[in-house]
């Protein structure tokens, strides 16, 4: 994946940004939906499933080096977050 900034991601999915403005220039080099695959410079997409809500893993992805999370509801964590109505639709828009 070509590196893109959080700002570019934000613009492509029309989300609301939660975080320090200087984080908008951070580079994202991978996008993951499995929290175990989060690594430095990745963006975690939190997906609500029937049994598991990916939002509960957002803090863990931050500790693994993720620079941003795409969420449907703000999570109590220091990671910069892009809040959207549907993370699935936003992921499609970003692609």
Regions found by a protein language model. Name each.
Residues 1-95:
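Short, basic phosphate-binding NTP loop
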């Amino acid at each position: 994946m070509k590196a893109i900034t959080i700002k570019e991601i934000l613009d492509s999915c029309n989300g609301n940004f939660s975080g320090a403005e200087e984080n908008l220039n951070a580079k994202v080099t991978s996008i993951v939906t499995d929290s175990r695959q989060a690594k430095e410079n990745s963006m975690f997409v939190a997906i609500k499933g029937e049994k598991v809500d990916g939002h509960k893993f957002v803090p863990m992805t931050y500790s693994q080096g993720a620079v941003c999370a795409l969420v449907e509801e703000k999570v109590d964590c220091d990671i910069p977050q892009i809040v959207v109505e549907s993370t699935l639709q936003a992921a499609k828009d970003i692609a």
